[in-house]
């Protein structure tokens, strides 16, 4: 009697914005996405994969920026740049590099549109929201805040966590964009979006990378927020206008 050999095929793709499909014994099962259904995906060709990596600090991060198609293969890999978020905003579509703009600042935590809010450089606060809300992306390693754009179980990093990562680069390329890319995080020169709405990336001669943190600036400039900046000659944490668009790299909590 012939033996029938059953081959069990398990396909386990886990993408942000899609369902996790498992084909097991001929049955299709699905697991909900780790992102809410109103989390806007900027590119219909792909969904951002949620893959964990452990850095030299021992912390677990996503292996790519939110909105990135792949892990960076070089510092200037455009497929790894990802989206550009205004500090504290939800993933409503404003983070898409080709999103429209409007000049009316918001008085609520979640604007009812998907435009990048343009703020004049003469603004007193340089923020897309008035009055400001310092807790939109969480405080002190909390779960992420009301507008946390990261998947379930992840949040924006604190300034201390960003600083620890930067300091860990010393042995793998230095506290520069070289160290940023040589690290397990493979941080690319993702560019940024000015508060005027202009997108500046490496291709336009702007070889900079910025990663938002969840912390706001101190008493020296309380209207700003903290971010990690890195380029060919240096890397550091600094105060930046909340109306600017920077990349987001999520850390696990």
Can you name each region flagged by the protein language model?
Residues 4-13:
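Sec-dependent N-terminal signal peptides
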Residues 11-12, 21, 25, 30, ...:
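Generic detector of low-complexity/intrinsically disordered segments
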Residues 15-47, 249-253:
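Enriched but not universal
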Residues 19, 103, 111-114, 130, ...:
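Positively charged, low-complexity intrinsically disordered regions
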Residues 29-32, 54, 105-106:
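Intrinsically disordered, low-complexity segments enriched in Ser/Pro/Gly/Ala and basic residues
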Residues 47-49, 54-94, 118-253:
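C-terminal, surface-exposed recognition/capping segments
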Residues 83-99, 103-113:
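Glycine-rich, aromatic-lined ligand/substrate-binding cores of catalytic
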